[in-house]
Structure formats: C-alpha cells, structure tokens
Amino acid sequence: MIRVAIDLMGGDRAPGEILEGARLFSRKDCKLFLVGTKEALANATGFEKVEVSDFLPMDVKPTEILRRKTSSMYIGLKLLKEGAVDVFISAGNTGALLAGATFILGRIHGVERPALAVPVPSLNGFTVLIDAGANVRSRPEHLVDFAVMGLSYAKVLGREKPSIGLLNVGEEETKGDETTRETYELLKRYFPDFFIGNVEGHDLNTGKADVVVTEGFSGNVAMKTMEGTAKMILDTLKSEVKKAGFVQKIGALLMKKVFSSLKKALDPRSYGGAFILGVNGLVVKAHGSSDRLAIQNALEVARVGAEMKIVESIEGEIKRVRDSGADR
C-alpha cells in the first residue's frame, strides 16, 4: 500500500479544498496522511491524522521552513525522511518546499540542484518540462542534471526512448546565450541517442521533444503562459456558446464530447502537480491555487510516482550517464 502525506495547510484554498480533494481521491491501495492543525483536522474522518501547531503562509520567506519545525510542511517532509510515508504533497510556498526538501531529504548523489518537472499537455500526450521554476538561473552542468532527471521521468511515464530538446530562441546551434550554447554541446556529448537539438516555445505542445530542458526562469514563464492561453481558449469557447443562436447551440451540444476532451487536455488542473526531482524522496508541488480537482489529480500523480519508483530510476540514470562519458 502506498502511503501519501498531504499538507492540509498549504495553498490559497487550504484547508477546505485540500480536504475535499483528498475525499475525491480515496483509493483502497493508498493510505492518506493529512498533516494539519487541530481545527483543520476536525472534520477529516477516514484518514490518518498528523496534528501540528503551525503552518507556513503563502508569502513566507523560503528559509522560514528551516526555523519553523512544527509547521505542516516541515513535519510532512520529516515523515517522508523517516520512511513513515512514500510521498509528500504540498500546495504551499514553492521556495519553502524546495528549501525544506533539499535540507531535510538531501540531494540524490550526483545532483547539484533539484528541479521542478511538469508533464505539460502535447499532441503526443505529454512533454516533460524541466526546470519549471525551482532555479531562476542555472549553469550548463545543472541543465545536464535536469536532462537526466527529465529523461528518467519520461521513461517512467511510458516513453521507451524519450527525445530531449533544449529550449532556446531558435533551432540553430549558435542561438542563445553562452550558458545555452555550452549546454547544447554537453547534451550532444552525453545524450547522443536522445538529444535532438534546440526547440522553441511553440514546440512545447507539439510533441517535437518528449523532454524540454531549460532554466527555471524561462521554464516557469513558459508554463504560466500555457496555463493562461488554455484558460483564454476555454473561456472564449464558453462565452461564444452562450452568445450563439439556437442552431449553433444545437451544434455545440452535438460536439459536447469533443469540447469535454479539449477541456481535459487544456485544463492545468489535469496534471495536478510537479515533482521536485533530485532530492532523496518523492515530493509533489501542487499549484498554489489548487482546488479539489487539482488536488485529486496531484494525489494520483503522487501515487503513480511512488508506484513507478521515480527516485530510484533517477539514481540509476545518473549513474548510467556518469559511467558512459567524460568527467563532468
């Protein structure tokens, strides 16, 4: 049985929507541990309860987690560290979760910086975007680590031979700044069978690459832009259907199944959360504005990650890369 701990106090809509998401998820092969204050846990029946006296607000400084050791986020990470649970989820402050995960769990041997990995919708199912916001700036060797972790994650998700692309302002080798050009050469050296070269922003959702590597600043901007575009498309469709005449509404009704599939593909809530990869434990960062549906999906992401042993897979992939080429 997979044991999942969730921070009941993290997120803009905590604790109410977090609790409702946990109720929606409910699976026989998973045991849920809710980490929260006495008040938040009062109506949480049918779950394992972990009572805490403190929680971190969304605008907290990232390093505060290291001082507030009775907070829900800190305690959840400690449960993971001690082996009491298999995976921890929080919709709380990203910086605090990253700092806490790195400090409490430690990094996987060979990884200098953890990264956020998000499977974004694409024409071939998904594209793993890494880093989606953990590191604003990164060195070329860090981006190679991200490629290793993204490759491993894509394999876990079912890609037998995932292709890797480097996010850039053009496809030519000479494009981009010094960091990007150096990263290009390293990826070509370490991943000759996987690296397909530079990809651009418009390639993220086309399936051109199964893994897209970038530093956290541009990765986060890309992810948020996709979320905004998806919202605009869905809201526009909804608005136009409401304004349409009788015949058009009949047509829309006949296409209800198509619209439902489109909504599912574009809705950011459908991918639930991002893994913080590179730490010695499985941690899922849910969106700060997560509602119950997003939390339900984040729990499913966590379950699959634990079942597929992502951390162990990354450890093996890093060893393979280290053994296959020149010193880093």
From Swiss-Prot:
Cellular location(s): Cytoplasm
EC number, as in UniProt: 2.3.1.274
Pathway: Lipid metabolism; phospholipid metabolism
Keyword match Lipid biosynthesis: yes
GO molecular function: phosphate:acyl-[acyl carrier protein] acyltransferase activity
A GO cellular component entry from the record: cytoplasm
Enzyme class, UniProt record, top EC level: transferase
Protein keywords: Cytoplasm, Lipid biosynthesis, Lipid metabolism, Phospholipid biosynthesis, Phospholipid metabolism, Transferase
Biological process according to GO: fatty acid biosynthetic process; phospholipid biosynthetic process
Record's catalysed reaction(s): a fatty acyl-[ACP] + phosphate = an acyl phosphate + holo-[ACP]
Gene3D superfamilies according to UniProt: Isopropylmalate Dehydrogenase
Record-stated family: Belongs to the PlsX family.
Family matches, as PANTHER family: FATTY ACID/PHOSPHOLIPID SYNTHESIS PROTEIN PLSX, PHOSPHATE ACYLTRANSFERASE
Oligomer and partners: Homodimer. Probably interacts with PlsY.
HAMAP family: PlsX
General function of this protein: Catalyzes the reversible formation of acyl-phosphate (acyl-PO(4)) from acyl-[acyl-carrier-protein] (acyl-ACP). This enzyme utilizes acyl-ACP as fatty acyl donor, but not acyl-CoA.
Name of the featured protein: Phosphate acyltransferase
